From Swiss-Prot:
Native source organism of the sequence: Clostridium tetani (strain Massachusetts / E88)
Entry keywords, A to Z: ATP-binding, Cytoplasm, Ligase, Nucleotide-binding, Purine biosynthesis
Record HAMAP family: AIRS (MF_00741)
Gene name of the encoded protein: purM
One GO location term (cellular component): cytosol
GO biological process: one example: adenine biosynthetic process
EC numbers for this chain: 6.3.3.1
Family classification: Belongs to the AIR synthase family.
Record flagged with keyword tRNA processing: no
The protein's name in its UniProt record: Phosphoribosylformylglycinamidine cyclo-ligase
Intracellular or extracellular location(s): Cytoplasm
InterPro entries: PurM-like_C_dom (IPR010918), PurM-like_C_sf (IPR036676), PurM-like_N (IPR016188), PurM-like_N_sf (IPR036921), PurM_cligase (IPR004733)
Pathway connected to this protein: Purine metabolism; IMP biosynthesis via de novo pathway; 5-amino-1-(5-phospho-D-ribosyl)imidazole from N(2)-formyl-N(1)-(5-phospho-D-ribosyl)glycinamide: step 2/2
UniProt keyword Nucleotide-binding, yes or no: yes
Length: 331
């Protein structure tokens, strides 16, 4: 008699992976979580809000995964998955409430799946949200053995009156950039086209390890700022770099002027440029050292930068808003 295992799906390994994941998942639970692992759906209590708006976002990690496969390093890629989602919803002032993950692979290995979920759990702890559900799909013949894909879904909340939507951004406002931790989770197809040996030495470690540095999660420091300062707009610098992401936070009759020498550029970006990528194209693909941007009135600039530094972040005035046609000018 044929079995599911004969077809390439190991149910026992699935049970094993769930048991290994439980510890990591439960670490993220907070008072809003109403049920545990194993139910058909997850439930979350909102608590006391006057006029709440739910804010959602979904994303993956892209071809950064290919480097993780090659180095067999699985425990940080989940942080990237969380970061890509929670940083996006943060742009509208939302506090992340909960997160769900989806992982698919050709052949399930319990320890690897648990390692990946540990990263998701670590990311949720950094973001202050609960990992309340997920799906692990074993799909023989669909993925190569040793390869997998991961995606996530975040839901946050903000009082309607506190939504950050960029409507008040005007000429003369300034942009504050918060430093990234490295390349983050975008542009890896380009990276992989110019870097062929991920075990090459780079500043005392192999370059693959540098490229796997987890995406920074900006939730806690930015939510602290929102308690005290009126931030007009925010942008998460992801795919499309400065040119595509910064205009998403302001109106059509404005330009943003960025001073490219106003912040330090991590060595990894100089290394990628040395492989034959034009600098201007880099700003259209990568974060170039700035992972999150705030738009504020100039009177708050110094206080906000000081507050970010107090919280352990590196922050810089990187540009300003002027009249224009919704363009980004980098000079």
């Amino acid at each position: 008699m044929a079995t599911y295992k004969d077809a390439g799906v190991n149910i026992e390994e699935g049970y094993k992976s769930v048991n290994l994941m439980k510890e990591h998942v439960q670490k993220t639970f907070n008072k809003g979580v109403l049920n545990g692992i194993g139910s058909f759906a997850a439930m979350y209590e909102l608590g006391k809000y006057k006029n709440p708006v739910l804010v959602s976002g979904t994303d993956g990690v892209g071809t950064k995964l290919k480097i993780a496969f090659e180095l067999e390093k699985y425990n940080t890629i989940g942080i990237d998955c969380v970061a890509m989602c929670v940083n996006d919803i943060l742009c509208h002032g939302a506090k992340p409430l909960f997160f769900l993950d989806y992982m698919a692979c050709g052949k399930l290995k319990g320890e690897v799946a648990a390692d990946i979920v540990k990263g998701v759990s670590d990311g949720c702890l950094r973001a202050g949200c609960a990992l309340i559900g997920g799906e692990t799909a074993e799909m023989p013949g669909f993925y190569k053995e040793g390869e997998y894909d991961i995606a996530g879904f975040a839901v946050g909340i903000v009082e309607k009156e506190n939504i950050v939507d960029g409507q008040d951004i005007k000429e003369g406002d300034v942009l504050i950039g918060i430093a990234s931790s490295g390349v983050h989770s975008n542009g890896y197809s380009l990276v992989r086209s110019v870097i062929k040996d991920f075990r090459e030495e780079f500043h005392g470690k192999i370059i693959g390890e540098e490229l796997l540095t987890p995406t920074k999660i900006y939730v806690k420091p930015v939510l602290q700022l929102l308690k005290s300062y009126p931030i007009k707009g925010m942008a998460h610098i992801t795919g499309g770099g400065f040119y595509e992401n910064i205009p998403r936070m302001f109106k059509d009759d404005l330009n943003v002027v960025i001073s490219k020498n106003s912040f330090p550029r991590p060595d990894i970006f100089e290394y990628i440029i040395s492989k034959g990528i034009e600098e201007n194209h880099m700003f259209n693909v990568f974060n170039m050292g700035i992972g999150f941007v705030l738009c504020v009135d100039p009177c708050y600039e110094k206080k906000i930068i000081e507050k970010l530094i107090e919280q352990g972040e590196k922050a810089y005035k990187i540009g300003h808003i002027e009249k224009g046609e919704r363009k980004v000018i980098i000079k």
